Each structure stands twice: as C-alpha cells, then as structure tokens.
Regions:
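Catalytic loop of the DD-peptidase/beta-lactamase superfamily, centered on the K-T-G motif
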Residues: 1-165
Length: 165
C-alpha cells in the first residue's frame, strides 16, 4: 500500500511562535534536544522519511504512517480500554528537557492537551496532532504532509481542537 503514502514536504523556515529555548537547544551541538531530533541519524531529514525503509522501520517514537481517521480511531479505542486510568495518570511533570517547556506525561502520552486536564495525546512531526478527551469521549486527529516549522500544532489547529472538544 506504499502508493497511498503521501510525500512529506519539509517546512519552510519562518519566524514561528515556538519557544526560543527549544530552537536554541535544537541548534546546540550535543544538546539533548538535538540528539533526540537527530535520532536515528540516517532518518533525521524529512526526505529520508519518504522512503519505504523508514515506513517499515517501526520506530516507537517516530515515523508513524497512517490517516487522520486511523489515528482518531486509535485514540477512540484507547478511551474504552481498562488501562486508560493508568495510561493518563501523571508520571512526570516539569521542565521537558527535550522540548524545553513545562510538560506533563502519562505512559507515552502528553497530558492536558485540550480544553480540560483529561485530554491526552501527542503532537507529531510537522504539525500533526492526535488526542482524546476523556470527559467528552471524543478523539481527534489531524495529519499533514506539508510540514510546518512548529514543534506543536499552530493556533488554527488548536482552535479546531478546542471548538470540537
């Protein structure tokens, strides 16, 4: 089904609203942020993620290939699982040493990503976003192949989430 995978298009450089500490860390050689965003080294550029070997690699923290509907269905499924309460229990809170912002995580998901603290999910590369709202039972996903230069979804995307949630 490789013919159904859209080509990823790198972001154009812009003056984004991203936190300055993140970009400073990203540009600092040997910083934790740079190491995290450069790993694995042979898949560090967007163009390399357009190759079937990247789609098949199955890295747990990057390179997911799917549709917005598929991602939203995944979060909808998670909402109905017995492990939900354990998944969204805060495990760590404070300064995220990679993203250089205050953050909170459960088991593999970021917490507080929507209109209430019971929202969980994760942003993806280039502005993609998937989350679920425990309070309303709603799941949401937005995927894109034309990357934005932001680490997190832009204001328009977040406004969509808040209006739907």
């Amino acid at each position: 089904q490789f013919s159904r995978v859209a080509e990823l298009v790198p972001a154009r450089l812009s003056k984004s609203g991203e936190p300055k500490p993140f970009y400073e860390a990203l540009l600092t050689k040997d910083s934790l942020t740079r190491r995290a965003f450069s790993s694995p080294s042979d898949l560090a550029r967007v163009s390399e993620m357009n190759q079937p070997r990247a789609w098949q690699a199955g890295f747990p923290a990057m390179g997911g290939v799917g549709s917005a509907l598929g991602l939203a269905k995944f979060y909808d499924w998670v909402l109905r699982q017995e492990f939900l309460e354990e998944l969204i229990k805060p495990r760590i809170k404070g300064l995220d040493e990679i993203q250089r912002i205050e953050n909170s995580f459960g088991f593999g998901v970021m917490l507080g990503l929507g209109p209430n603290r019971d929202c969980f999910g994760h942003p993806g590369a280039g502005g993609s976003y998937g989350f679920a709202n425990v309070e309303t039972g709603m799941s949401y996903a937005f995927v894109m192949n034309h990357f934005e230069s932001n680490l997190f979804p832009n204001k328009e995307r977040l406004d969509l989430v808040l209006s739907a949630g």
